[in-house]
Amino acid sequence: MSARIIDGKTIAQTIRSEVAEKVKQRIKIGKRAPGLAVILVGDNPASQIYVASKRKACDEVGFISRSYDLPDTTSEADLLNLIDTLNEDNTIDGILVQLPLPAGIDNVKVLERIHPDKDVDGFHPYNIGRLCQRAPKLRPCTPRGIVTLLERCNIPMNGLNAVIIGASNIVGRPMSLELLLAGCTTTVTHRFTKDLRFHVEHADLVVVAVGKPNFIPGEWIKPGAIVIDVGINRLENGKVVGDVDFAQASQRAGWISPVPGGVGPMTVATLIQNTLQACEEYHDPDIGNN
């Protein structure tokens, strides 16, 4: 059996096109374009690439994108002051602080300083709490993007035995909340989990986000299972691979997301969706600020 490929690149482009059309309609009736502020502290090469892709996506859909490239000597106080200024800026609907931040800056304090209605990454405790209470507002980008992938492929999630490998704040933990909301029976595994293979072999849906190349052998995958590979790992030969042995897993799975071209493009597309949502639901003049 050969798995069907979950084409995140194509689905993400469709979402971008949908958002671009909505922006055109907003402008046509006299409303402003959504605004996104992207803050990069330091010169981490990987972060620079991620930020560039987000800015490009903003331009593509017609958003107003504002860039703040700060030196790695920036103090925590200066960064917090910038966020305060952007929180008060009525032309900015979303504030994104690219992680990781340099040593000496408290990630939690910075993320909590962003107003929840401008938290388009979905990391603020308020937004995570809303998701936990089954009343989501702005949702974490990668987990929401994964759910969108499954929905756009018409893959029903209700009743699935789902296993998440990795318990990070960015993917694993919010992913568990998204899958609970979708009706899955959800297990989160982590570095203390015993007999990981057992959990994977019994999973109808596997979401892997550990950042280790080919960490999950393809032979562990249950025949017909859905495999979502969040990992992006560059090997010494320059090849980019995921956390799952794709060659083997694709011969057993029913559906599988490739790396690259699977989850990655959806994270950026969801950021764009969240920014439009923040603009339309929380910041339009006829709505008023919360």
UniProtKB/Swiss-Prot annotation:
Keywords: Amino-acid biosynthesis, Histidine biosynthesis, Hydrolase, Methionine biosynthesis, Multifunctional enzyme, NADP, One-carbon metabolism, Oxidoreductase, Purine biosynthesis
Protein name listed in UniProt: Bifunctional protein FolD
Protein function: Catalyzes the oxidation of 5,10-methylenetetrahydrofolate to 5,10-methenyltetrahydrofolate and then the hydrolysis of 5,10-methenyltetrahydrofolate to 10-formyltetrahydrofolate.
EC annotation from Swiss-Prot or TrEMBL: 1.5.1.5, 3.5.4.9
Gene behind the chain: folD
ATP-binding among keywords: no
Pathway recorded for this protein: One-carbon metabolism; tetrahydrofolate interconversion
GO MF entries: methenyltetrahydrofolate cyclohydrolase activity; methylenetetrahydrofolate dehydrogenase (NADP+) activity
Subunit structure of this chain's protein: Homodimer.
